[in-house]
């Protein structure tokens, strides 16, 4: 299963990074250059019919390979911000998605909107890294964490002033997210175990999500009418990556969905 492969490779990488830069040294680097995260809840909470999009900076994926050959992460991010993205998602996983923490740091330096560190996070060190490199919120995938692990990581993120987007794909994942106290719940139409898509997932899961939660729809989103349909179901914002990455002008494609 691809999720297991990514998880194992991420564990290997993390072990190496911890040896190069131990936790206390990573924390000291933050103390010498403090960063104050932005208000992610305010940025993503829908106001009336406003369309809010988390636009993604993504070079590749395990299911599609390289998506964007002419990949300039900063140029893409600036184009997103110019065209009114609510936030930017930055892939930092290097092997399967060709991402980098350096992309996150670079984009933070030149943009003002909230940034999501999108990676396979299972350790507090990765959350501290996210803060050091300039993220305002992190992705936590319910499928790859136990209830207790998810709760612990979510609480640690908040302790640092970060928010978390807790990604779910089924009722079991949703139970974990609610138990952990997630405020932002992402419904991923794509099953990460086999990459199959279920575009009716929001219809199935949203009725079980408390009204106080911010709901994000993820994957397979490229049609304004479908976005409006999901808004009517209660979706606050949309995470869109591959669709924009395949377009010649990602900013123009973003603007067309707003």
Curated annotation (Swiss-Prot):
SUPFAM superfamilies: Ribulose-phoshate binding barrel (SSF51366). It catalyses: 1-(2-carboxyphenylamino)-1-deoxy-D-ribulose 5-phosphate + H(+) = (1S,2R)-1-C-(indol-3-yl)glycerol 3-phosphate + CO2 + H2O. It comes from the Bacteria. GO terms for molecular function: indole-3-glycerol-phosphate synthase activity; phosphoribosylanthranilate isomerase activity. Its EC number is 4.1.1.48. Pfam families: IGPS. Keywords: Amino-acid biosynthesis, Aromatic amino acid biosynthesis, Decarboxylase, Lyase, Tryptophan biosynthesis. Gene3D superfamilies: Aldolase class I. Pathway: Amino-acid biosynthesis; L-tryptophan biosynthesis; L-tryptophan from chorismate: step 4/5. One of its GO terms (biological process) is L-tryptophan biosynthetic process. PANTHER family: INDOLE-3-GLYCEROL-PHOSPHATE SYNTHASE, TRYPTOPHAN BIOSYNTHESIS PROTEIN. Belongs to the TrpC family. This is Indole-3-glycerol phosphate synthase.
């Amino acid at each position: 299963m691809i999720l297991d492969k990514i998880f194992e490779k991420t564990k290997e990488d993390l072990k190496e990074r911890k040896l190069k830069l131990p936790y206390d040294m990573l924390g000291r680097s933050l103390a010498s250059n403090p960063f104050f995260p932005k208000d992610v809840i305010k940025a993503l909470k829908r106001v009336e019919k406003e369309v809010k999009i988390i636009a993604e900076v993504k070079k590749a994926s395990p299911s599609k390979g390289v998506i964007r050959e002419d990949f300039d992460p900063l140029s893409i991010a600036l184009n997103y911000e110019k065209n009114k993205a609510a936030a930017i998602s930055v892939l930092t996983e290097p092997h399967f998605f060709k991402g980098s923490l350096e992309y996150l740091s670079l984009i933070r330096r030149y943009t003002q909107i909230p940034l999501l560190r999108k990676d396979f996070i299972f350790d507090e060190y990765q959350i501290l890294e996210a803060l050091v490199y300039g993220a305002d919120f992190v992705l936590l995938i319910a499928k790859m964490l136990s209830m207790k692990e998810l709760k612990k990581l979510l609480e640690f993120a908040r302790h640092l002033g970060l928010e978390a987007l807790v990604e779910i794909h089924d009722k079991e994942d949703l139970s974990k997210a609610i138990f952990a106290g997630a405020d932002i719940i992402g419904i991923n139409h794509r099953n990460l175990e086999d990459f199959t898509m279920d575009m009716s997932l929001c219809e199935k899961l949203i009725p079980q999500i408390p009204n106080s939660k911010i709901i994000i729809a993820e994957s397979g989103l490229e049609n304004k009418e479908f976005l409006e349909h999901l808004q009517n179901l209660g979706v606050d914002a949309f995470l869109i990556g591959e669709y924009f990455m395949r377009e010649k002008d990602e900013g123009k494609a973003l603007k067309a969905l707003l």
